[in-house]
Amino acid sequence: MAAAVEALYVVLEREGAILPRQEGFSGVYVFFSPINFVIPPMGAVMLSLRLRVCIPPGYFGRFLALTDVNQPDVFTESYIMTPDMTEELSVVLFNHGDQFFYGHAGMAVVRLMLIRVVFPVVRQASNV
């Protein structure tokens, strides 16, 4: 019996959505902005990526800040993604600097890290 192929399935929902790129052979995927955007100084923007992902069973995902944006003051906020989530993905980007940040369509904006999890059974013990 052949082993099941694990894959991160991506549904491009709307115009401008860009397929993420895997970093090497890691469990990290780079996502790109579908539009031009501006983050004001000390401000934030909620950026829709215009896509959905299907996290493989046995994993959970988390967005990470993208350090190679070359803008040291721009950070991201995220939540844990599980295989049962189906909503379109958005990312909140914060600009903690004193200059406007100008992003463009096709620019890398966030990383998704997939983390393998195990589901051990619960057993009662008299001593640990």
Curated annotation (Swiss-Prot):
<comment type="function">
    <text>May modulate tight-junctions functions of infected cells through interactions with PDZ proteins. E4 ORF1 has ben show for Adenovirus 9 to interact with protein involved in tight junction regulation. May play a role in mTOR activation by activating PI3-kinase, thus overriding cellular checkpoint for translation.</text>
</comment>
<keyword id="KW-1043">Host membrane</keyword>
<dbReference type="GO" id="GO:0016020">
    <property type="term" value="C:membrane"/>
</dbReference>
<feature type="topological domain" description="Extracellular">
    <location>
        <begin position="48"/>
        <end position="99"/>
    </location>
</feature>
<protein>
    <recommendedName>
        <fullName>Early 4 ORF1 protein</fullName>
    </recommendedName>
</protein>
<dbReference type="GO" id="GO:0033644">
    <property type="term" value="C:host cell membrane"/>
</dbReference>
<feature type="transmembrane region" description="Helical">
    <location>
        <begin position="100"/>
        <end position="120"/>
    </location>
</feature>
<comment type="subunit">
    <text>May interact with host PDZ proteins through the PDZ domain binding motif (PBM), namely host DLG1, PATJ and TJP2.</text>
</comment>
<comment type="similarity">
    <text>Belongs to the adenoviridae E4-ORF1 family.</text>
</comment>
<dbReference type="InterPro" id="IPR036157">
    <property type="entry name" value="dUTPase-like_sf"/>
</dbReference>
<keyword id="KW-0945">Host-virus interaction</keyword>
<feature type="topological domain" description="Cytoplasmic">
    <location>
        <begin position="121"/>
        <end position="128"/>
    </location>
</feature>
<feature type="short sequence motif" description="PBZ domain binding motif">
    <location>
        <begin position="125"/>
        <end position="128"/>
    </location>
</feature>
<keyword id="KW-0244">Early protein</keyword>
<feature type="transmembrane region" description="Helical">
    <location>
        <begin position="27"/>
        <end position="47"/>
    </location>
</feature>
<keyword id="KW-1133">Transmembrane helix</keyword>
<dbReference type="InterPro" id="IPR029054">
    <property type="entry name" value="dUTPase-like"/>
</dbReference>
<keyword id="KW-0812">Transmembrane</keyword>
<dbReference type="Pfam" id="PF00692">
    <property type="entry name" value="dUTPase"/>
</dbReference>
<keyword id="KW-0472">Membrane</keyword>
<feature type="topological domain" description="Cytoplasmic">
    <location>
        <begin position="1"/>
        <end position="26"/>
    </location>
</feature>
